[in-house]
Design a protein with these regions (language model features):
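Ligand-binding loop in jelly-roll beta-barrel domains
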Residues: 78-102
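Short, conserved beta-strand element in jelly-roll/cupin
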Residues: 31-33, 43-57, 97
Length: 107
């Protein structure tokens, strides 16, 4: 086979998993039930956050929190302070693409 095949979790519990980690790209998959959040952190590359299911509450730097439902791709610049959470009843599922991959950023 020419292609590399990777699987991602299909659960109803909290999941934060790294699917691909290469110099050119990092792809993470996350599932957050209601009330769950990621630790506050700064974007370590250019981030493209894709909401697949549910609604994400996203607070960037000093901005007020914004809510985005499924079907959105959010582009977040490198070094932006991020607060990501699920404050809604529906399970939140997202993919996060970082390009270039953080280990190659700034080389």
């Amino acid at each position: 086979m020419i292609e590399n095949v990777r699987k991602f979790s299909r659960k109803n519990d909290k999941v934060v998993e790294q699917i691909i980690d290469q110099d050119v790209v990092m792809i993470n998959h996350m599932i957050l039930p209601k009330g769950e959040a990621l630790p506050e952190h700064k974007a370590n590359s250019n981030v493209f956050m894709m909401t697949v299911k549910g609604k994400v509450t996203l607070k960037l730097n000093d901005q007020n929190p914004q809510v985005y439902d499924s079907g959105h791709i959010l582009e977040i610049p490198h070094n932006t302070l991020m607060n990501v959470s699920n404050q809604h009843d529906e399970l939140l599922e997202l993919f996060v693409v970082k390009a270039p991959g953080p280990k190659a950023y700034g080389r």
